[in-house]
Amino acid sequence: MIAKGSEPWLFAAASATALFAILSWATDSLPFLNHAAHMGMALTFFMVIFFRDPERKVEISDAYMISPADGTVIDIRDRKICIFMFLQNVHVNRAPISGKIREITYKKGGYLPAFCKDSERNERNEFIIHSKYGDVEVTQIAGTIARRIVTYSNVNDSVEQGQRIGMIRFGSRVDVTIPHDFDITVCKGERVLAGKTVIATIKNDRDF
């Protein structure tokens, strides 16, 4: 499955590849056109890999929160988990918990490397999901390459745990806040999968 909103990128790459291939054939394979056609094929393949959006079976539960993004945990502080998405990761983001989207705020900013602390001033999109345990903030942060944040959801939408809520093109970072009713279960350096990896579990003294 290809990620929603990626069609124009794939069409552009495939069209350029086809154009160079036709020109190369029509001109008896001029070296630079032949090279351009091969580069276009490689770019199209990269786009297909990058914009993939595999179906994942999500085990929905109020007993835990799941990762909103594929990637590596690069920081955990003040009950916030920061996940860096590399280029090879799936870049579709998912709701870590079921609830209602209370607020979506887009903020302009810079494009520093997303793994730097100064990236807090980067372009971002902040979701506030109101859950039965309080508000959960999911923040999509742009980086040096990722300069296009895509939103699939709207304010007042009800979302299920694991539902697709957006995407960041070409790698970046997603932060998620953890309510005090939960214990964080991941560590810095751990690899996580959106919709699959449990990142926090409900405390034993709470009912669900």
UniProtKB/Swiss-Prot annotation:
Pyruvic acid (Ser) modification sites? S172
Which compartments is it annotated to reside in? Cell membrane
Cofactor note as given: Binds 1 pyruvoyl group covalently per subunit.
What enzyme class is recorded for this protein? lyase
Pfam families assigned to the protein according to its UniProt record, in alphabetical order: PS_Dcarbxylase
InterPro entries tied to this protein: PS_Dcarbxylase (IPR003817), PSD-A (IPR033175)
Identify which residues the record assigns to the active site.
S172 (schiff-base intermediate with substrate)
Instruction: Mention one GO biological process in which this protein takes part, according to its record.
Output: phospholipid biosynthetic process
Enzyme Commission code: 4.1.1.-
Domain of life from the UniProt record: Archaea
Q: Could you say which protein family the record assigns here? A: Belongs to the phosphatidylserine decarboxylase family. PSD-A subfamily.
| Record's subunit section | Heterodimer of a large membrane-associated beta subunit and a small pyruvoyl-containing alpha subunit.
Q: What is this protein called?
A: Putative archaetidylserine decarboxylase proenzyme
What gene is it encoded by?
asd
